[in-house]
Each structure stands twice: as structure tokens, then as C-alpha cells.
Amino acid sequence: MLIAGAGVTGISCAIALRERGVPFRIVNKGRRVGGRMASRIVRDSGTPFDGRVFDTGASYFTVSESEFASVVAKLETAGVVQPWTDTFHFADAEGIAGVKTGPMRYRAEGGIRSVVEYLAHDLVIEEGEITKLPTSERLALCMPTPQAARVFPPASDLSSAVWEPVISVSMLFDHAHWSDFDGIFVNQDAQITWIANDGARRGDQAPALVVHMSPVLSAGHLGDPSEVIPIAIARVQKILGFDEEPTWSHAHRWTFAKPIEGTTSPKPGFVL
């Protein structure tokens, strides 16, 4: 079995195959595992926070299935993940409007990528890109469907699934200019959808925020994600109520961040 992609899906697939004694190999386009469970190390920022990790992709994860709960329990025992919070704030375009309780969200002190790195620590992963389907192997395409269709043309029907882009903007400040919070869902705002207190999420209480831009705004700036940084700063200042500028910022583009609409009639053997 050939597994294309070393995000959490690809690594989980590999672990399941290994447990069943099925031979496999993993090929990953990037140098590091994780996919959209991504973290970035701050470098050359001119701040005291060089070496610090930001979560630039998935913000957290929740547990709803008992089988996954057993995996998370092992990760927690190993110190890889920690319970974070079950309460987030919500805001509108003018500011924070209230709080909402939901399922427990889990964080990873070493960055959410460290979860996948831990799971993959004893797997052999080849770096490279699959450009055509090997005829002698079964294939697991563990990637967004538009990318899968490029590798495997018979999966072109799956490329009809609609995916939203997101640009995430990471920011560092000289100190926290905001009251305590973990995360804020921003509703009915044309520019941003989410603000994470990365200092609370990481557990180091650093004056660090991560903002997710709206899909529509992100789609217009995929060619140069840095263009949205001033917009993100202005919205954060408005919602959190301060005027200070960040000492460092960085924008990351996710062209295929999440699916919002899938194909309804896949060919036999293809499942989203």
C-alpha cells in the first residue's frame, strides 16, 4: 500500500495497516509531517520569542469517539497533549459579546504538529511528490480532494467538493494588551472568523495571537498572504480594544483549509 500524505490521516492509516500486518510506504511532499496540523517556529523576529512555536493550522481538536479517546489518553499520559478549555468567547464586528461552553478542546504544548510527529516517530517517511499512480500498488490519497485529483485522474469527480481557503496571521506583542481569554469565534464579520490566544493555548502565556481570516477575504489574497496582515491587526485591535501594534507578524496561506460541500455521488471505491 502506498500512502500519499503524512498528515494525521496518512499517519493514522499507516498505523492501522501496521497493526494488521499490511506492508506500506509513506510518501510526503513536505519535509515535515502534520499537514494542516501545522506549527511554525519563530525565527529572526527581533523579539525575545525566537524559537517559540505558533499553531498556524488547526487550532485544537476535540474527542467524540471512544476509539479516538483511547489514543488521546495515551497522548496525554505521554505529555504530548493537554486539556485546554471548554469555553470560548464569541464576538461580533464591534467586540466581545459573550461566552459559550462546548466540548473540551485539547492543545499540544509543543505545537499541534507535535501530535502527528509523536504518532509518526517510528515510521519511515519518504520525501517526494507522486505525479502519477503506480500501477503495482494500492494507493491511499491522504490529502484534500482537489490535490488528490491531480495525482489520480479517476478521482476527478471528487474534485467537485468545495473547499474554503484560510489565511492565518500570527502576531507577537510586547505584552498582552487584552483581558484573559482562550479563543474567540468572530461572527458576522467579513474579515476574520477566529482569534486564538496562543499564549494560553501553548501554556507559556506569551503575548501571542493567531487570527484566521474569512474565506472570502482569504480567497482574494492567496497570491500574497502578507497583504491581509494590516487587516488582521486592525480587526484584533477593534475587537479586543487596544491600539498597540505587534512587534512581529506572519501570514500563512491554506488554499484548501476545510471542505464545505462534498460530492454526492462518488464512483464505487471512492469515499470522502
For each feature predicted by the language model, list its residue ranges.
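Glycine-rich FAD pyrophosphate-binding loop
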Residues: 18-48
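Central helical "cap/lid" subdomain
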Residues: 34, 49-51, 137-185, 242-244
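Active-site substrate-recognition segment that forms the wall
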Residues: 171-221, 231-240
